[in-house]
């Protein structure tokens, strides 16, 4: 056979022969073109010359010669194309002709590997393993390169070609990082295109896993591994099943799992994820077990055992560890199985407290819970109650019990009533019962309870008390010969009394009395002798006695005398001694009812002398016999000392020439009157008799200059004394003094008219401002003089004095010298509108300067007057450029001198200058507005860098100029000068030209997706910087940056890929911007990222990617076969991020390329993927009812595969068996565990991919055993059993029951394998039968044989137990019966504080309401109810409530202080209060107070229901207060079981501590001060059931009741209550007579005394208003003036006589009433702004206090005062008209004071002045005033007044609202009165009617503007009208006087005072007219209209 080459040559030869041609031509050709690809070659050549024959032969090293078919392209060109060549191979081409052969060598391109990928199995955290299949064709080597995510080359390698398998591993990489790998095939000098794949290193696992465990949660912590991490995934597995999972970011180092099962073991996996790969670490973790619940330790009444029960906690429990300990010492410890829930401890100590700890153990963890329990205590032994001989006492003794106890509780019973309940310490073995209110002689029962914790055990015994003696044995009365005793009967049993009286050791009387006797009188006794009286109580053979000592009253002395023996300071007395027993004599010296001497004299003495007495005073000497502290009746005699003469006599002429006044110091002692005599030369000129209180007088019409003698005689009784003095009158003064300057500046002439009378000479003095200059003595015959060398312009005072002896008379005159003009008058400075002139001051005195400004001799301004020290003046607001004349006048008094000067103003500068470049780069235009005044022209100049560029002169009518040829962007200084003559005024401004724009702007992306580079050429002119703006294609600004003027480019980074941008450049110079230069540019679009395979199956591949950043237009997607052929392509929207290819071949590798397009730019990414082989089908498993075998079968897999792999898994994931084969369809597994679930995997393998099918099957389980029941409740119980052996598997148990009720089965352990269940929903009390089976499997279950058990439930508890108080001694309880079968209820009621059982009984099941009676008031009780059914008891249900508390029931009238059972002294009353007076039915009485009232004949039976009442200090310092209370003292009645026998001894007025103790004026508190002597008092006892809370804060509304007032009890008189009173009355009458005489003598004088009444608030008046006492006032000023109604009109006419003289005088007397009180709080700086007028302030004592805010001491202030009325001491509140800032305070006061009525008697605005702010809503919309909400409900407008109704409530108490009426009188002028009386009277009556219909309301608020004038008139009229309705007299003066004691200026004007009289007169007239005509006039004034008009003299003003 020929070779291929030889055959080709032969073929060519034969061809040539067949052509039959001659010798062929020679071929000349040249190679034109040659191309080569991987599998083809193309070659072309051209024939040069004539056509010829040729052939083309090609060959390679693996291929012999072959002919390449040629084809003709044109006449001279030929070619040959070869296909299906071997890649990478060198081919030799020969073009053969007959005479020439040309060789061409061509090589095909090599191909890359067909498959190139990353081997995940061999990839680690630091290495990446790549593999590829050999390329087809020839390859000499492969070049493999590794790139990071940013396509930066990391590593590269050249690997020689291998025929089988090619691979390479990159080391030292970063864990968790993505890499791109490129491979290129190299063959000779050619390289294939690169093939890419990507891969990732495995992330590093976490390190140092830490576990923090709790019962329901696990806290996992870890440390980061090396390399990159994207996230951590945590998985908590339970037997291969995911229980919980979570994903956290790469920075996290901890994670918490919640909701876990306590005590459970989990498999924890912490997985690190990065670059699509994972790595993990795992660890076994366990949650902490939970502690048991409902742990209870009970003793069941046992002394020596305890029972412990608990409920199993949820979760897993392995066992329980129970320990019993006492005080930290473990007594016993036990380990119990987890299904046990109770245990018992025995042989314990009685009464001991044990600690029981139950630990739940799960694995290595445990949870503890502790409870305590106590054994029942033992009883005491040998209990006895004995009498110790003491009254009201028993001694209880006993022997201690066995075991432990804490204390004893001792109860004392009187029958069934508990008298004593007390606790004593455990170390005690006896207790003495004292002060427990035991009744003597009575038998009691004692119970001793041993208490240990809350457990008790008791023992009882009986005992009896000793009888009691009588109580409060005292001497009731004693006189000179008799002694009466009285006592109170004790609470005891007795038969009679034995009465005895003894004198020292001698028994005088011994007598038996009946048991009802309470007093006895002993007679025929010796005066002043001491006796012992004894009362003995006899009861059977027992007795007890009580004794009291008493003394008879001693006898009085006789024949008492007193004398002064002519001395001024001594008295002498003597007497005859008294009969009977006398210890001493008490001698008192009394002066003006005050004891000034108190001496005790021996009984043997009968005389005494008094020294150092007051002269002229009348004294009373009292001698009293005293024996044993008892005084006899007093004997009184009077005597007087001689009066003293006066001293300090002063005679004064008072500067008068016809008058002398005489004054002296009052003579010491007492004086009746003085006689003053004036004499001259021994002749009496005048004589006056002066009252003793006056110490001065005067004499007039005397001769000037004469010497007089004054004699003052002191008289007292029949005695007198004398004093002398002399004095002279003042001489007369001159007349008509004249002073003249004669037009000279240094000269004055003085002249006068001669003085009358006698004088020595004249003295003339000239002075200036009290500085003497000259004094001249002038003979009495001359009448003028001259003064020279004086100061110019000075005012001089000239005094002409008449001299006569030591006295003189002055007359003054004034004169002034002429002033001089100013000096150095100069124009100092000038401006456009100012002239500044200065000068030097004129010589001499100058009063002021007057300066004038003239223009053309006309005054420009009015003259200006300057002080005399002024030396300059500036004229302003002048006209610029104008000439002015300035004139300066020197003025001294009424004379003046002048000087002047002339000057000009500066022309004004231009204004409103505006410079603008007008958008040009080379010019500036300036314009301006001319200034004021005249100007000739303007000069405009431009400067650049201080160099003048241009300057122009502009006519005065031109106001604009433009500068040209300037530089762009440059700053210029422009100067504009106003020119006026030689003066200029210029202004400099700055302007800048517009900068030029840059040129040649270009934007380039430099192949970047995130940046653009902008470049430009520099702008012309001056530039500071370039502002470069980056905008969107639509012109939206994205960035704004600046570059220095020297920069020519800028790079924008962090841009959006594929986005088109606009760029603008502005040149900036001095804040000006050039025109923008603009260009456009686009960034390269970004390729997609995170391109990945999301799903691959046997027939399709799904890809997903992350969208390209930035903007893009669309995606092109290509899918290539392994040979590079396109399989499929698609174009998708930019929003698409996934794509799938369907109907692919199984197991094939594909390449997917995605290209991103944006505009004209693009970018791409690619990835490889393979399909999955098919799996088997119909895989099934079956156990065939066996417990140890499983059978599986299936159908074969379709498609290609290599083999099957069978894997059987245990439940824990471990492999049980593993088999491999290709032709299997069934398999059996044997030797398996019963009940266990197995999983079979059948895996189909094909290449590196596989597919599997799984099936599950389970063996049958084993049955349970040993069923039991626990925790049996009413609707639930626990069932436990023993499960199958531990080595078997099972999942659950199935529980069934009969009857088939709808029950709920709960697994409390959260583990289905737990050997117990809790069943809910049971019918209480029902019997059930249960069976249990073992269950294996969840969906397909197998069951074991059942086991059975029966049980019955408890009855249910009651529902909605509600107990509420019925009254103070009963409560009611109701409930809903349980839905259960039951027999009845067991009910107990206990006291909460003592736990004593007060009530216990069984109740039928049909009842659900119970009343419990006979309880203690105001005690909290606990009611417990249990349901009972067939020996089963439900849970106890408890509720507590408190019995009611209320005011104590008012005692009956006979229960009060008995005036017969009191002991009385001059300052105290001793009486007894008994607990039985007040019942505790409505609650225990907690406190008492004593209410004391002066008896005044009123019919009030009980105290006013007001709290608190005034204190003792208020009562003593305010005469209008008649009632006071003592301090509160605690009641101990509730502590005494027999409280009716408890009594309190009260000594009122003795500074008793319990009543408040001694009074301290510095402390405002309740106290117990001494009572007034000889004063009748009525006493009431006030008892409180509620007064203070637990923090001793007083309740706002305490609960109390009062006894009836006692009958009047009169205190004893002072010792001089007999004769002294008579003498005092006589002296009082004499004094009054002397006062009347003195008043007639000095009737024109105003008394110097001023009242100082106390301003305490009055208690409710009980006396008629016509009766006023002068207590608390000095002098004899009246406080009331009651007028009988039938005499009123005549009285009013008398007051109106002589132009209202008497009425004005009466009103004037009220001027200073109350003004002595302090207003310190109102004057504080913080409070001044709260006063409308600074002279109308509230007194501190009567002001209204608001509640404090935020501890601000001034926040309680408001200008308001309490005012008393006829009914209450705080009947009104008077306030000012609210200010804008005090409206909130006003409404706060209304709210806090419980105000229901407001009276307003002013308009808000009067005569244009605001009198009161509008402080209420204008409409019916609600408004806030502070925290209060006010709403107007209605408004009734009448002609003269308006009535509004408001609703007010607190912001936090919207339901607790109050209605308030607002009475607004609208026709009353300020400081005046209404036109008629009818209008106001009717208004007052209307308001009073509303007030009377508002019971329980607080004070009525009344206000005008200041709150004194109209307000006072309204209140006074209201009180007066009430008097007219209820009394026969009216007291207007007293009403106003009372008002002014509480607020200043009440009834402010006299016309208002008269108006009140007119109102009374008109009311009385109308009443009389109504009576006559029987036509009702009041209150509606119908039919009759009398003239209710004011008198004309009091018209409005």
UniProtKB/Swiss-Prot annotation:
It catalyses: O-phospho-L-tyrosyl-[protein] + H2O = L-tyrosyl-[protein] + phosphate. Its EC number is 3.1.3.48. Residues 1-22 form the signal peptide. The chain crosses the membrane at residues 1622-1642. SMART domains: FN3, PTPc, PTPc_motif. Glycans are attached at residues 28, 53, 75, 172, 198, 267, 321, 414, 421, 479, 544, 574, 598, 652, 721, 829, 1040, 1096, 1163, 1185, 1212, 1274, 1367, 1470, 1474, 1518. It is found in: Membrane. Induction: Up-regulated by hypoxia. It is a single-pass type I membrane protein. Residues 23-1621 are extracellular. GO terms for molecular function: cadherin binding; transmembrane receptor protein tyrosine phosphatase activity. Substrate binds at residues 1870, 1904-1910, 1948. Residues 23-111, 112-207, 203-288, 291-378, 379-471, 467-552, 556-641, 642-729, 730-829, 819-906, 909-1001, 995-1083, 1087-1175, 1173-1260, 1260-1356, 1357-1448, 1458-1554 form the Fibronectin type-III domain. Residues 1643-1997 are cytoplasmic. GO terms for cellular component: plasma membrane; receptor complex; specific granule membrane; tertiary granule membrane. It holds the Pfam family PTP_tm. One of its GO terms (biological process) is protein dephosphorylation. Residues 1703-1963 form the Tyrosine-protein phosphatase domain. CDD domains: FN3 (cd00063), R-PTPc-B (cd14617). Plays an important role in blood vessel remodeling and angiogenesis. Not necessary for the initial formation of blood vessels, but is essential for their maintenance and remodeling. Can induce dephosphorylation of TEK/TIE2, CDH5/VE-cadherin and KDR/VEGFR-2. Regulates angiopoietin-TIE2 signaling in endothelial cells. Acts as a negative regulator of TIE2, and controls TIE2 driven endothelial cell proliferation, which in turn affects blood vessel remodeling during embryonic development and determines blood vessel size during perinatal growth. Belongs to the protein-tyrosine phosphatase family. Receptor class 3 subfamily. Monomer. Interacts with TEK. Interacts via fibronectin type-III 17 domain with CDH5. Detected in a complex with CNTN1 and NRCAM. Interacts (phosphorylated form) with FYN and GRB2. Interacts with IGFBP2. This is Receptor-type tyrosine-protein phosphatase beta. The lineage of its organism: Eukaryota, Metazoa, Chordata, Craniata, Vertebrata.
